[in-house]
């Protein structure tokens, strides 16, 4: 009888270990030769993210973490169907610039830290917000359309964002990212917010953003909202950097 109990206990422990292992998140790090090849040669107007700047016909820039998390992204299109980074999108980068006061849109892919999260080199830079001129914003999605939970990712501000906001933010100003999760029918399943600037103070280091509250989703879109406006619209640059996206494996 004792042997039977021991066998049953061993089976239970093994099953528990298997379950825990299956629930360990898979991390999208943006590291490796595939991702290095997706970093444009210049931060603004480069061939990868903008294509032919004279013709303005767009580019086929996209990425797909095919053998890992299954996440993918493409650039947003304008009214003519041209996919260009200024319409919104997710760009791989390794640019660093700590002199934020001198950073403008030509340094849009740089961050003021020593590199990606946890000592890595690469990261991803989001551009885009929903407004009267732009009905879409950058997004990531699971290419196989199978819903998964994004547990968290790590966020920091870009050098361009800080170079602008540090000069204009008052003690009451704020900027936030609104992440919206969608199912396979493009129906909203959840939202989550993260403040890049709050009470006039902006983050300048990698900070964890828990996203599991979105639940299982197929796509997550990132919208930038801010209290800092003028007569033309939002003046806070609609950018943020992120890294180490943790995805719970599909069951």
What are these model-derived regions, one by one?
Residues 1-6, 11-38, 249-251:
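Bacterial Sec-dependent N-terminal signal peptides
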Residues 23-134:
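N-terminal targeting leaders for non-cytosolic proteins
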Residues 29-44, 105, 162, 176-187, ...:
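Buried hydrophobic residues that stabilize the cores of well-folded domains
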Residues 128-149:
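Short beta-strands within extracellular/lumenal beta-sheet-rich domains
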Residues 132-133, 170-174, 233-235:
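Short, solvent-exposed loop/turn segments at conserved positions within beta-propeller repeat blades
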Residues 142-143, 167-169, 209-211:
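Leucine-rich repeat
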Residues 146, 154-199:
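Extracellular ligand-binding interfaces
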Residues 177-251:
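Terminal, low-complexity interaction segments
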């Amino acid at each position: 009888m004792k042997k039977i109990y021991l066998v049953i206990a061993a089976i239970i422990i093994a099953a528990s270990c298997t379950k825990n292992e299956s629930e360990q998140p898979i991390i999208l790090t943006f590291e490796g030769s595939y991702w290095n090849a997706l970093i444009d040669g210049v931060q603004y107007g480069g061939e990868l993210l903008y294509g032919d700047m004279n013709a303005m016909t767009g580019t086929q820039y996209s990425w797909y973490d095919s053998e890992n998390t299954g996440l993918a992204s493409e650039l947003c299109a304008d009214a003519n169907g041209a996919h260009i980074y200024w319409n919104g999108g997710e760009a791989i980068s390794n640019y660093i610039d700590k002199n934020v006061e001198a950073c403008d849109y030509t340094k849009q892919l740089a961050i003021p830290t020593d590199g990606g999260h946890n000592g890595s080199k690469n990261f991803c830079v989001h551009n885009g917000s929903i407004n009267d001129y732009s009905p879409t914003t950058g997004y990531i999605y699971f290419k196989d359309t199978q819903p998964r939970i994004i547990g968290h990712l790590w966020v920091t501000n870009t050098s361009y964002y800080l170079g602008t906001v540090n000069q204009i933010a008052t003690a009451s100003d704020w900027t936030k990212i609104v992440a919206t999760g969608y199912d396979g029918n493009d129906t909203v399943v959840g939202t989550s917010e993260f403040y890049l600037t709050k009470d006039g103070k902006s983050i300048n280091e990698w900070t964890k953003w828990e996203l599991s509250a979105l639940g299982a989703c197929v796509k997550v879109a990132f919208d930038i909202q801010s209290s800092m406006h003028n007569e033309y619209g939002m003046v806070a640059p609609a950018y943020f950097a992120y890294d180490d996206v943790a995805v719970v494996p599909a069951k």
